[in-house]
């Protein structure tokens, strides 16, 4: 019995192991497949993340470049619109250089220093010239005064003897001038004076004409502007009137459509019915009185007809 029991136990263990192997084998296959899929997914995700990072970095670089370009464009437009900056840009830039706002102060200071240096050099040169002239004049004045005085007297005497008179681009000595020459000179001066006066008159006339023309032109321009303004105002008023008429016509059409709509018609009928009921309720007693009077009249007519019939029968019996 014990051997049989042990054998049975061994068989049970073997069967259990086989069943476990059978059940575990598909599980292991599934695990292997999952592991492969996971490994492939992990590798794909790594490369995908790497690609995304590169893409993001490229986009960031593009955005930064666009921002810098836009800033440069804005700076250039500001420089073009500002007259002072545009002049500085023309003077400071060459064919291949670009104007830098950061170097503006340095360039100004350099320009000022150069100007100051030039001024100082000019002052020094002038001072040197003045000193040299003063020394030369002193040397001249230290010469013999007697000779200088004699030379001055001689020059004055010669100048008085050789005074010349110019007329029509010709020179004459005062002592040798005749009356004819003086008449010619007076005639020439009169002609020149008359010409000057005529020129002045002509210029005045021309200026007056120009002023008149300008005034007329200004008046015409003002009149044209007034007419233009009046035309614009008339056009605006016409447009306003047309808009008002159009709006009023649209409102009337909307009202008509509302009146013709089924809801509005139902409301109207309801109102009429309510009015009729109110009238009927208020005049109910009067209607009953009229009916009673009508019934009495009917009875009276019936009686009269009966009497007429009786009279006709009596007349017929007498015949």
Curated annotation (Swiss-Prot):
Coiled coil: 100-134, 166-242, 281-310
Bias type Polar residues, positions: 16-26
Stretches for region Disordered: 1-43, 112-158
Biased amino acid composition, Basic and acidic residues: 1-12, 27-36, 112-131
Presence of the UniProt keyword Coiled coil in the record: yes
Record flagged with keyword Coiled coil: yes
Biotechnology (record note): Possible candidate for an effective malaria vaccine as determined by epitope response in sera.
Residues making up the signal peptide according to the UniProt record: none
Composition bias type Low complexity, residue spans: 132-150
Name under which the protein is recorded: Coiled-coil domain-containing protein PF3D7_1144200
Protein species of origin: Plasmodium falciparum (isolate 3D7)
Lineage: Eukaryota, Sar, Alveolata, Apicomplexa, Aconoidasida
